[in-house]
Amino acid sequence: MTTTLFLFAGTLLLLLLSRATHVSSATLCPPCGNTTVPFPLSTTPTCGDPSYKIRCSSSNTLVFDTLNNSYPIESIDPNSQRFVIRPAPLLTNTCVSTDKVHQGIQLNTTLPFNITSSNTIVYLNCTTTLLQSPLNCSAASACHSYINATASASACQGAGPLCCTYRTGGSSNSYMIRVRDSGCSAYSSFVNLNPALPVNRWPEPGLEIQWLSPKETVCGSQQDCDSATSTCGPDASSALGIKRCFCNDGLVWDPIQGVCAK
């Protein structure tokens, strides 16, 4: 009898502890192929946070849509809230990027994504108007080493009077990498590049994008929230009457895991 009571008490204690540490989590999206989709990234309207939309393509690869083009996602780091997309390649035997028709990479400024300050942009086939810009278009610019050592950029050796480099991070390039006739016709990008290294030791081309910390999950009623951890209430910062599952007293919102936790 004593043993039975002890086991019952132990089971009850475990249930209470489980209840006390329970968290209210957002619905995570299923993997895209072999790639995990972390919160708040969303591949369908019913998972993640739809404001952070990306796509799982028919070939089971993740894709990031800009205003007028799409780019493959190469890697995701949920802890730093960043992912890396693959820049557009050059048209064969030319010094023109395939996305020049779209004027390069242009993010939607109303969405919670922006270009990080970790990217070095190599601009190719540029006009002399760039000499009036803060870009490094000098003879010492790393773009010359890139052109001379990169087979796919060999057509750039005789194209355009200039090539230039710059590091992202300014307000003018937080949402776009522009490619156009009046500026530069081609580009590449490298994350955390040390330009002093030989080109064969540069990382693979990539452009790092970061997302803003997500707010609490959207709700229509209390049924959409876990009452043990959160309460559906109006978002005072929204002019659209949006409601969210705000964490109950003693719990805080974890924007990386998408949960209310201690």
Stretches found by the model and what they are:
Residues 2-262:
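Typically disulfide-stabilized, N-glycosylated extracellular/lumenal ectodomains of secreted
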